[in-house]
């Protein structure tokens, strides 16, 4: 998530230009998350940057938060980011499922990221890193606290 105003359509007077706010400096946070499309159970952590060590930390925390169930496969749908493919990753009780190249839309969590950005970050600019973190935490907690809404966003309709 960044402090870049998300563009939307708006009406303006003919011949005038709409003002688009910007801060002039770059503030960024990375969210790594997992969602169960059926139950809406959602887990995420916020980082300043992502690499294989950070991703391993996230996997370790996810493994503690989502315990294994006998007879249940736990799939992690992943894009082809370099840190997803490091040979030394400990997957715990999860099974990685890599998407074909250039097809992130097949990942259910991508719909959640789009909704989160639309609902919480359209037309909003973070003034500080703390502002961004507060807004981001509020947005993530909303989806954690409303699993039925999260499931409806992320589930595949048949």
Where are these regions (language model features)?
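Acidic, metal-coordinating catalytic cores used for nucleic-acid/nucleotide bond scission
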Residues: 1, 50-51, 74-87, 101-106
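Short, basic/hydrophobic alpha-helical segments
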Residues: 54-73
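C-terminal anion-handling pockets and recognition modules
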Residues: 110-158
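RNase H-like polynucleotidyl transferase catalytic core
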Residues: 16-24, 92-111, 124-125
């Amino acid at each position: 998530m960044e402090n870049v105003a998300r563009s939307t359509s708006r009406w303006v007077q003919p011949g005038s230009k709409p003002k688009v706010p910007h801060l002039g400096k770059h503030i960024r946070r990375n969210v790594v998350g997992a969602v169960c499309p059926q139950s809406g159970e959602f887990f995420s952590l916020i980082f300043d940057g992502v690499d294989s060590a950070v991703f391993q930390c996230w996997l370790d925390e996810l493994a503690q938060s989502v315990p294994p169930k006998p007879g249940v496969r736990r799939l992690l749908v992943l894009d082809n980011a370099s840190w997803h493919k490091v040979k030394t990753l400990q997957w715990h009780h999860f099974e990685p499922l890599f998407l074909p190249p250039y097809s992130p839309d097949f990942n259910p969590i991508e719909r959640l990221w789009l909704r989160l950005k639309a609902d919480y970050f359209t037309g909003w600019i973070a003034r500080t890193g703390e502002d961004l973190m507060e807004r981001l935490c509020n947005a993530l907690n909303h989806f954690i606290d409303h699993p039925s809404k999260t499931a409806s966003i992320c589930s595949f309709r048949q």
